């Protein structure tokens, strides 16, 4: 595991604070022609924090969490898919090779988000890039807010993540160019 990715996550965690949570999905595969996909390229922001380059994955950063702040939801290993698309890390491989604290199946994303939103005041996410991801996040956000009457802290806002991430990436680029 590259320590640079870990350092970037620590910086982002400081920026969003212990009352915030960041959600960063990766890019989807793009169909080229019926059963042929374009070569896969992960979302730049997702890769900047994880170093992980499989499709159908979401990084969640929840600072101060007892079970670890770095969570990834991804596809489970599938031998048939690996024949066509190549090696898959799977739930255990992503923990071992990328320093993930906890990993879950991507199918459980809404449930995971709903539980992680409890006790947080702000959700950092970039809306408008993926309708399916937007709907999943908004459903979890609204489910948690609907249960607010039971007490406890729940998110009151969704803030754009891009300005924070791009400021970090700009500074990283600047320091690389100064050498």
Q: What are these language model-derived features?
A:
Residues 1-179:
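A composition/biophysics-driven feature that prefers long, compositionally simple stretches
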